[in-house]
Swiss-Prot record:
One Pfam family hit: LysE
Subcellular location: Cell membrane
Protein name: Uncharacterized membrane protein slr1627
Family matches, as PANTHER family: ARGININE EXPORTER PROTEIN ARGO, ARGININE EXPORTER PROTEIN ARGO-RELATED
Domain of life according to the entry: Bacteria
Length: 206
């Protein structure tokens, strides 16, 4: 049974829509992938960001302490793996060739890298868990939350976060058709350096 009222659902939708539109690491990642590799790469990066937000929402609802206790040492190992992989993605982004978007062939492996970049850049921002822990109780009673409430919150995240990031990917793709190869290369360097920095931070903070 749904415990959230329509006013709360609409308020949550509006708040998440505004927050998703703010400039962030995920926006830069999605935009750079789309501008340099085509809209499909921006789309997959956006899907990774959405999955990361869904994971954070579930962690916030179930409790980070419970998750950390249940996973034990694997929680720390997972941070190391994420840090190394994110750094590797950053290096590959810097080294990636800038393609002509109208002629570039879509590579499944590169699409998975774009998805992983979006996911890991989101999961690396561990403050987001604390944000959701303080944010969600404003709209729903987390102590008496129903499964239908969780489904509504996740659907709201998909529509707002996903919609906004995909829109950013579309804009970056359209702009990318007009951006020079040199500027696309600069965008790749910025996004790659960002991923490496976040990956290193995960490693030294584990």
């Amino acid at each position: 049974m749904l415990t959230m009222g329509w006013s709360n659902i609409l308020s949550l939708f509006g708040a998440m829509l505004i927050l998703a539109a703010l400039p962030s690491l995920s926006v830069l990642t999605v935009s750079s992938k789309s501008a340099s590799g085509g809209f499909i790469h921006g789309l997959f990066a956006a899907l990774g960001v959405v999955l990361g937000d869904i994971i954070f929402i579930l962690i916030a609802l179930w409790g980070l302490a419970f998750l950390r206790g249940a996973m034990g040492d694997f929680f720390v190992i997972l941070k190391y793996i994420s840090g190394i992989y994110l750094s590797w993605l950053g290096i590959n982004t810097i080294r990636a060739k800038v393609n002509n978007q109208s002629l570039a062939k879509v590579d499944v492996k590169s699409l998975s890298s774009s998805f992983s970049a979006g996911l890991l850049i989101t999961l690396a921002d561990q403050k987001a868990v604390l944000f959701y822990l303080g944010f969600l109780p404003t709209f729903v009673d987390v102590n008496n939350i129903a499964y239908l409430d969780i489904a509504v919150i996740i659907l709201t995240a998909i529509l707002t976060v996903g919609g906004v990031k995909i829109f950013y990917a579309f804009l970056a793709h359209r702009s990318g058709l007009l951006i020079s190869r040199q500027n696309k290369r600069i965008m790749n360097y910025l996004a790659g350096a960002l991923m490496i920095s976040v990956g290193v931070f995960l490693l030294i903070s584990s």
